[in-house]
């Protein structure tokens, strides 16, 4: 049984024959990125670097970000979100599996009308957490103040991107709120449920999907 990253045949433009390359390298060339783990510094630098590079290479063609993540660090998630708002191409965010905590924050960062959830995906939002309980009292107070600022900032973004009133989002974030794809669409976290898109494009060219998949 093969171990490691799968390899697939890929013909580099200009070459006569295809060569076997890592699957993810092929996907990157097709402007398709994956957030499939906890959001930490390494994966954040990886994704943001690719977004910037792809934007420099082609500032028009869309980028596709598939998300299946339990969430992770606040600052790392905000870094991905801010990069998505900065690069020039539109970014599709596509949730498959789960987008929880900061992963749901990344999900709503996609271009409006281009945020998608697969039919059986689960989306969860809640308030930011911290390990402040380990700190001494002065540090505790400073961290609580900073956490409050971050929470307010994140709540404002959710409210802006979903169209919900600030107070509604703030109350919902007091607890873990899990949603189905349809519930997430009704809430404003995503714009389209995946099966709706399949129905819409079943008799037409799937322009919403990466070029490499159109002949599959």
Swiss-Prot record:
It comes from Agrostis stolonifera. One of its GO terms (molecular function) is ATP-dependent peptidase activity. Its EC number is 3.4.21.92. HAMAP family: ClpP. Keywords: Chloroplast, Hydrolase, Plastid, Protease, Serine protease. Cleaves peptides in various proteins in a process that requires ATP hydrolysis. Has a chymotrypsin-like activity. Plays a major role in the degradation of misfolded proteins. The active site is at 101 (nucleophile), 126. PANTHER family: ATP-DEPENDENT CLP PROTEASE PROTEOLYTIC SUBUNIT. Belongs to the peptidase S14 family. The keyword Metal-binding does not apply. Signal peptide: none annotated. It is found in: Plastid, Chloroplast stroma. One of its GO terms (cellular component) is chloroplast stroma. Component of the chloroplastic Clp protease core complex. InterPro entries: ClpP, ClpP/crotonase-like_dom_sf, ClpP/TepA, ClpP_His_AS, ClpP_Ser_AS. GO terms for biological process: proteolysis. It is an enzyme of class 3 (hydrolase). This is ATP-dependent Clp protease proteolytic subunit. It catalyses: Hydrolysis of proteins to small peptides in the presence of ATP and magnesium. alpha-casein is the usual test substrate. In the absence of ATP, only oligopeptides shorter than five residues are hydrolyzed (such as succinyl-Leu-Tyr-|-NHMec, and Leu-Tyr-Leu-|-Tyr-Trp, in which cleavage of the -Tyr-|-Leu- and -Tyr-|-Trp bonds also occurs).
């Amino acid at each position: 049984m093969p171990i490691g990253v799968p390899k697939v045949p890929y013909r580099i433009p200009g070459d006569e024959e295809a060569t076997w390359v890592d699957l993810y390298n092929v996907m990157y060339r097709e402007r398709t990125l994956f957030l499939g783990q906890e959001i930490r510094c390494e994966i954040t630098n990886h994704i943001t670097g690719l977004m910037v590079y792809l934007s420099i290479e082609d500032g028009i063609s869309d980028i596709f970000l598939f998300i299946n993540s339990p969430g992770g660090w606040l600052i790392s998630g905000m870094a991905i979100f801010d990069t998505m708002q900065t690069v020039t191409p539109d970014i599709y965010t596509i949730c498959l599996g789960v987008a929880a905590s900061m992963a749901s924050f990344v999900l709503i960062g996609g271009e409006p009308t281009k945020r998608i959830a697969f039919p059986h995906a689960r989306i969860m939002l809640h308030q930011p957490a911290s390990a402040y309980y380990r700190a001494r009292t002065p540090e505790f107070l400073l961290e609580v103040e900073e956490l409050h600022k971050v929470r307010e900032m994140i709540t404002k973004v959710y409210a802006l991107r979903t169209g919900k009133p600030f107070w509604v989002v703030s109350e919902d974030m007091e607890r873990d709120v899990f949603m189905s794809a349809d519930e997430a669409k009704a809430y404003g976290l995503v714009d389209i449920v995946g099966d709706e898109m399949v129905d819409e494009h079943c008799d037409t060219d799937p322009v919403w999907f990466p070029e490499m998949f159109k002949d599959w």
